[in-house]
Amino acid sequence: MGWLEIIELRSSEISREKMEDNLRKLVRDFSRINNELEIKAYKRIDVGTDSSIHILSRSTKSVSTASEIGEKLKAILKEYGYVSHIVWSELDD
């Protein structure tokens, strides 16, 4: 049983290129901190101001709240615009 956090960002005042560079740096930095999690950044194909970071864990322990890394990323991304943060739990077999 794993879990997935999705942190979506809708930015308005920053160029797409700069936002993508910032997201790449955040993913690199946070991946170094915790190698148990898979952290990836995505950009929305049809909306240039939308991006997201996905944090995937294959941990067997259940979660009921966002991870510490997820909360930190959310706080950082709020500087750039509207942020949505959702935690998903994998269905048991």
Q: Which positions does each model-derived feature cover?
A:
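Short S/T/G/P-rich N-terminal loop/turn motif that feeds into the first structured element of a domain
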Residues: 1-50, 55-71, 86-93
